[in-house]
UniProtKB/Swiss-Prot annotation:
This is Arogenate dehydratase/prephenate dehydratase 2, chloroplastic. The lineage of its organism: Eukaryota, Viridiplantae, Streptophyta, Embryophyta, Tracheophyta. Residues 289-375 form the ACT domain. Pfam families: PDT. It is found in: Plastid, Chloroplast stroma. Pathway: Amino-acid biosynthesis; L-phenylalanine biosynthesis; L-phenylalanine from L-arogenate: step 1/1; Amino-acid biosynthesis; L-phenylalanine biosynthesis; phenylpyruvate from prephenate: step 1/1.
Length: 381
């Protein structure tokens, strides 16, 4: 099989994962050519045009003609992904052999397992940061991203809520993963030898009772599998990692204890992200995610939620985040935060009742965006 590499910046590595040092999307990188060994000339032309295309060229001229050329190439080529229907989404889940999926972390991360559940047989591509995974999809380095959004014990992943708004990706599905934490150490290290434990802050919090009983000093790192990798590579004999059983196998560590999480029903929900939305259907249970903002005033949030209650639409989640551009608003002698509201509700955008609810919400929302309408994951792994 021909090897392929992506040359966008010196720090960008395709097969070894994707670093956070990607060129900014609003700046044209030098020599931005994507080469696929032994690929067709049409495919080479496609990715060359993609790498060079920006909203405006260096002299400020409109690139609309160039954009039309790219659009035509997309339509003519069978090599590039097209907008997905819900049926195609199901097919891609059952046969994801050519799908490249970005996740945050290193090999053995729970996010890698979620990516493999969402797209079996996919090529899972590790990224250093959540931001990098979003940008990798936008810049065609990968086809999809699978990123955590909430945990049943630790709550919401606020960083990814902010990134959903900042980037122009669409939620095309969700996947729920049962998280089973293990305590990992090097072979020959007994539990009595341990003095400290390394892991992601949420993983440490989810194992609070066990770690307190063991009297271990907590040390936070970027991700669970990264902690396991550090224990193995640095040959630490006084430290353990909270990570997955899969991470133990990858890094050759001993499982000192299994299922150390405080709650056996420890579940993380991940979002499947793509460049194009799927076409919502009505043949199965769908969920829709939106974000909106409101003018301040008595009962305004009540009115916003009432548009769903009046139509018997069930809300499954509501999350508020301060509005970054206008964080504080003065009223009299007081200052208030302005908020964005992220809401998930059980309905497909193909349903007229959901469409009517959003039309109603638009009447008094100052901002409204549909993040995605996608099938609900009813399985657990």
């Amino acid at each position: 099989m021909a090897m392929h590499t992506v040359r966008l910046s010196p720090a960008t590595q395709l097969h070894g994962g994707i670093s956070s040092n990607l060129s900014p999307p609003n700046r044209k990188p030098n020599n931005s050519i994507v080469r696929y060994g032994c690929g067709s000339s049409k495919r080479f032309r496609i990715v060359t045009v993609l790498a060079s295309l920006r909203e405006n060229d260096a002299n400020g001229r409109d690139n609309s003609v160039r954009a039309m050329e790219v659009k035509k190439i997309f339509e003519d080529s069978p090599l590039l992904p097209k907008p997905l229907s819900s049926n195609q989404l199901t097919e891609s889940v059952s046969n994801g052999s050519r799908v490249r999926v970005a996740y945050q972390g290193v090999r053995g991360a729970y996010s890698e397992s979620a990516a493999e559940k969402a797209y079996p047989n996919c090529e899972a591509v590790p990224c250093e940061e959540f931001d990098t995974a979003f940008e990798a999809v936008e810049r065609w380095l990968v086809d999809r991203a699978v990123l955590p959004i909430e945990n049943s014990l630790g709550g919401s992943i606020h960083r990814n809520y902010d990134l959903l708004l900042r980037h122009n990706l669409h939620i095309v599905g969700e996947v729920k993963l049962a998280v089973r934490h293990c305590l990992l150490a090097n072979h020959g290290v007994n539990i009595e030898d341990l003095r400290r434990v390394l892991s992601h802050p949420q993983a440490l919090a989810q194992c609070e009772n066990t770690l307190t009983k063991l009297g271990l000093v907590r040390e936070a790192v970027d991700d669970t599998a990264g902690a396991a990798k550090q224990i193995a590579f640095e040959n630490l004999n006084d430290a353990a990692a909270v990570a997955s059983e899969k991470a133990a196998k990858i890094y050759g560590l001993n499982i000192v204890a299994k299922d150390i999480q405080d709650d056996c029903d420890n579940v993380t929900r991940f979002l499947m992200l793509a460049r194009e939305p799927i076409i919502p259907g009505t043949n199965r249970l769908f969920k829709t995610s939106i974000v909106f903002s409101l003018e301040e005033g008595p009962g305004v949030l009540f009115k916003a939620l009432a548009v769903f209650a009046l139509r018997q639409i069930n809300l499954t989640k509501i999350e508020s985040r301060p509005l970054r551009k206008h964080p504080l608003r003065a009223s009299g002698g007081l200052k208030y935060f302005d908020y964005l509201f992220y809401v998930d509700f059980e309905a497909s955008m193909a349903d007229e009742v959901a469409q009517n609810a959003l039309r109603h919400l638009e009447e008094f929302a100052t901002f409204l965006r549909v993040l995605g309408s996608y099938p609900v994951d009813t399985t657990m792994l």
